[in-house]
UniProtKB/Swiss-Prot annotation:
Protein name per UniProt: Ribonuclease Y
Record-annotated membrane-spanning stretches: 1-21
Gene Ontology MF term list: RNA binding; RNA endonuclease activity
Highest classification ranks of the organism: Bacteria, Pseudomonadati, Campylobacterota, Epsilonproteobacteria, Campylobacterales
PROSITE patterns, A to Z: HD (PS51831)
Organism of derivation: Campylobacter curvus (strain 525.92)
Length: 517
């Protein structure tokens, strides 16, 4: 029994010990699990904090990016607004300038109309005065002894005529001077605008071209055996070839710029190739001529495009390119036409005309010069005929006629072309005139002035652009001097051809002489 109890007690003790051991293990596992749970909780908490922090950074970056885009957009819009505002200001200024110009023109028109009305009224008053004076004088002279009716009438008419001429001269001089002042002021403004806004290149043509060669041995090859090569060159190319002692150079001379340019290119190719013989010369001449014809067409098309003009007929375009090889008084015709086109466009724009049409007329005003080597007739008639054939604008045709005085300018654009042509052609150094023609023109102008009654002497000065006329003070009074100047100017316009204008100055000097004895 005791043994049983002892065994039972030992079993109970073993069970208790096992329970305690198991509990200890469970407690240890629980603690481990708890620590792991805490660690995971901390990790989750850290990750949550990190995620929150990253989220805040992303939000800040997004806000920064959005603000930057907003600022960029705002800056761009402000810049565009500023540009639009500046453009509107410029347009507004242009409109204001145009309005001011219109107001000035309106004032000038009103002023001219009032002056015309005043002149008309003064004329009526003068007529009435004239008639009343005649009646009064007739009544007085009827009672004068020793005078017949016819003699009295002649005396009265002579006095009235002298008085009327003096009054008319006074009125003409008054209004003419005022009109000249206003016109000169306006013209100076327009010309200043035109010349300041356009600065063209100066192009003067010579009568020779120089071809450089590597050595003087090539001169002999160009001459050829018994002069065969040089004879063929001169016959085919149509130029004079001068081979002298000038080192490393051959001179080509011709008044025809087109032939001279082709000849220069042909000889350059011959010298470069080395094969100089008659057959080769003819082949190269044909090839170079075809290339030049193509380049002429392209040159004309490029000029039309550069000026911003509407389509021009290909034949006229080709003639524009040919102007490059024409010259007038040493001035290149194409350079002159381009200069006139630009100046005419500016002048037309300043005076309320069509700028594009003025440019077109300016470019084509001398187009006939491209035909003068092939056809008979003046360049004015040839140019007008070719433009009529290809249905150019009537203003263009009128400008062609008007710039040499064959017709009156019928539009602002035609008048602008005439003014631009004078600006381009008459400026110092633009053209070279033959001395004989210059002297002949000066002599003709002086003779016209001397042919007038009461003129003692006349002198052409300032390169023939001014004529100073010395009047006899006993035969011509101050009022008559005004009329004489106008008569001389009108006769010069009708009989003398000249570029620009000629100023007529009538000088009358009165001297009172006495002697002390």
């Amino acid at each position: 029994m005791i043994e049983v109890l002892i065994g039972l007690g030992a079993g109970v003790a073993g069970v208790g010990a096992g329970y305690l051991y198991a509990k200890k293990i469970n407690d240890a596992n629980y603690n481990i699990f708890l620590e792991q749970a805490k660690a995971k909780a901390k990790a989750i908490e850290y990750e949550a904090e990190l995620t929150l922090k990253n989220s805040k950074i992303s939000v800040q970056e997004a806000e920064f990016e959005a603000k930057k885009r907003y600022d960029d957009k705002t800056t761009k819009l402000q810049k565009e607004y500023s540009q639009k505002f500046d453009e509107l200001n410029k347009k507004e200024q242009i409109l204001l300038n145009e309005q001011e110009l219109l107001n000035e023109n309106k004032e000038l028109f009103e002023k001219d109309r009032n002056e015309a009305k005043l002149t008309y009224e003064e004329g009526l008053n003068l007529k009435a005065t004239y008639q009343s004076k005649v009646q009064e004088a007739l009544k007085v002279l009827e009672h004068a002894a020793g005078l017949t009716e016819d003699e009295a009438r002649e005396v009265v008419l002579k006095k009235v005529e002298e008085k009327s001429r003096a009054d008319i001269a006074h009125i003409v001089r008054k209004h003419e001077e005022e009109a000249k002042r206003e016109a000169k002021k306006r013209v100076n403004y327009i010309l200043a605008q035109a010349t300041s806004r356009f600065a063209g290149e100066f192009a003067a043509e010579r009568l020779i071209n120089v071809v450089n060669i590597k050595n003087d041995e090539l001169k002999g090859r160009i001459i050829g055996k018994e002069g065969r090569n040089i004879k063929t060159l001169e016959m085919v190319l149509g130029v004079d070839i001068i081979i002298d002692d000038t080192p490393h150079a051959i001179i080509l001379s011709s008044f025809n710029l087109y032939r001279r340019a082709i000849a220069t290119r042909v000889i350059e190719l011959l010298v470069e190739d080395g094969r100089i013989q008659p057959a080769r010369i003819e082949d190269l001449h044909k090839k170079v001529t075809e290339e030049f014809e193509q380049s002429i067409q392209e040159e004309g098309e490029n000029i039309v495009i550069d000026l911003g003009l509407s389509k021009i007929h290909p034949e006229i375009t080709k003639l524009i390119g040919k102007l490059k090889f024409r010259a007038s008084y040493g001035q290149n015709a194409l350079a002159h036409s381009l200069e006139v086109a630009h100046l005419a466009g500016i002048i037309a724009a300043e005076t309320g005309g069509d700028e594009k049409l003025a440019k077109r007329a300016g470019l084509l005003h001398d187009i006939g010069k491209a035909l003068t080597h092939e056809f008979e007739g003046s360049h004015v008639d040839l140019g007008a005929e070719i433009c009529k054939r290809y249905k150019e604008h009537p203003v263009v045709i009128n400008a062609i006629y008007a710039h040499h005085g064959h017709e009156e300018a019928t539009s602002i654009e035609s008048a602008a072309v005439c003014a631009a042509d004078c600006l381009s052609a008459a400026r110092p150094g633009a053209r070279r005139e033959v001395l004989e023609s210059f002297l002949k023109r000066v002599e003709e102008v002086e003779n016209i002035a001397k042919s007038k009654d009461g003129i003692k002497q006349a002198y052409a000065i300032n390169a023939g652009r001014e004529i100073r006329v010395i009047a006899n003070a006993k035969l011509i009074n101050d009022d008559e001097a005004v009329l004489v100047a106008k008569e001389i100017a009108k006769e010069i316009e009708e009989k003398v051809q000249y570029p620009g204008e000629i100023k007529v100055s009538v000088i009358r000097e009165t001297r009172a002489v006495d002697y002390a004895k």
